[in-house]
Swiss-Prot record:
Gene3D superfamilies: protein yfey like domain (2.60.460.10). Keywords: Signal. The keyword Signal applies. This is Uncharacterized protein YfeY. It comes from Escherichia coli (strain K12). The gene is yfeY. Residues 1-22 form the signal peptide. The keyword DNA repair does not apply.
Length: 191
């Protein structure tokens, strides 16, 4: 009984003491985080980044758990100026995060260390995932108009962008024969 009273008295002190150490990366103490990245693209989002994550630097940094650096920017989309974040891993862009209505709406993953939960990652060949583009793929738009975007099988939120060599007319999709040698260059999650 005495140890129970002591524990009840010590518990609030321990809990308040931990709250003052918010800068400590506690997830690093978990053994399953010791060996490699646990960040994956899933139906819910990318790692802890989901559709409910506010499009704010601190919220994104908290969800990334200190594993990356953030860089913010502005761009125009459909005639509006919008904010976006680039997630940096060293000197390379690992992810681009876009949003609307105050929360994350799209995450473009460019880092081969962040796979989809199905195992697909940057560099996976088209032929490993699809036998033909028809019914699965379409030309990518915007800055990526030389690429092809394909919906991930069984997914409502994930698609893969493939790129490779092709010298055909602009605006047309490459043939299935050409696409079989293309590789995933971007994994896209949309809300």
């Amino acid at each position: 009984m005495k140890s129970l009273r002591l524990m009840l008295c010590a518990m609030p002190l321990m809990l308040t003491g931990c709250s003052t150490m918010s800068s400590v990366n506690w997830s690093a103490a978990n053994p399953w985080n010791w060996f490699g990245s646990s960040t994956k693209v899933s139906e819910q989002g990318v790692g802890e980044l989901t559709a409910s994550t506010p499009l704010q630097e601190q919220a994104i940094a908290d969800a990334l758990d200190g594993d990356y650096r953030l860089r913010s920017g502005m761009k125009t989309a459909n005639g509006n100026v919008v904010r976006f974040f680039e997630v940096m891993k060293g000197d390379n862009v690992a992810m681009v995060i876009n949003g609307d209505q105050g929360t994350i709406s799209r995450i473009d993953v460019l880092d081969s260390d962040i796979p989809a939960d199905t195992g697909v990652k940057i560099g996976t060949p088209f032929s490993d995932l699809y036998s033909k583009a028809f019914g699965n793929c379409q030309k990518a738009d915007g800055d990526d108009n030389r690429a092809v975007e394909c919906k991930a099988e069984g997914s409502q939120h994930i698609s893969y962008q493939f790129s490779g060599e092709w010298r055909g007319p602009e605006g047309l999709m490459p043939s299935d024969d050409t696409l079989k040698n293309w590789k995933v260059s971007k994994i896209i999650w949309r809300r």
